[in-house]
Amino acid sequence: MFRGATLVNLDSKGRLTVPTRYREQLIESATGQMVCTIDIHRPCLLLYPLPEWEIIEQKLSRLSSMNPVERRVQRLLLGHASECQMDGAGRLLIAPVLRQHAGLTKEVMLVGQFNKFELWDETTWYQQVKEDIDAEQSATETLSERLQDLSL
């Protein structure tokens, strides 16, 4: 399970160094093989260990290519999916088209989200966090039953 937000830097080749605390887990569970794709709702990237991505691919394969909405989701997620292999120094090369999509240049937030990571431009990440907190503080809708059961 991946959790927490960590500031990492992209080098001049577009590689990020995976924090040490995640490397062993990624080597054991995925032999360092990852898949990166776009988030279709937010300006960030999604980074999955290969076995987790294969589950997503199976679900995507069950969608209908005749349904325009389902086909669009398939096209966006699969069309942008890029395999990346963690090298001996714990680095992952993020494809240029993906870096451009999320506006990633130098400082990147690696955000653990259970079975995957989100990759955000640092400034965009902090703006999103502020928007999310503001939305929660001004929320008028009733919490879902699942959120009501979440006791913090």
UniProtKB/Swiss-Prot annotation:
Alphabetical list of Pfam families matching this protein: MraZ
Subcellular location: Cytoplasm, Nucleoid
Residue span(s) of domain SpoVT-AbrB: 5-52, 81-124
Transmembrane segments: none
Record GO biological process: negative regulation of DNA-templated transcription initiation
UniProt keywords, alphabetically: Cytoplasm, DNA-binding, Repeat, Repressor, Transcription, Transcription regulation
Gene Ontology cellular-component annotations: cytoplasm; nucleoid
Keyword Cell membrane part of the UniProt annotation: no
Molecular-function GO terms, alphabetical: DNA-binding transcription factor activity; transcription cis-regulatory region binding
Similarity remark: Belongs to the MraZ family.
PANTHER family xref list: TRANSCRIPTIONAL REGULATOR MRAZ
Subunit field text: Forms oligomers.
Described purpose of this protein according to its UniProt entry: Negatively regulates its own expression and that of the subsequent genes in the proximal part of the division and cell wall (dcw) gene cluster. Acts by binding directly to DNA. May also regulate the expression of genes outside the dcw cluster.
Protein name: Transcriptional regulator MraZ
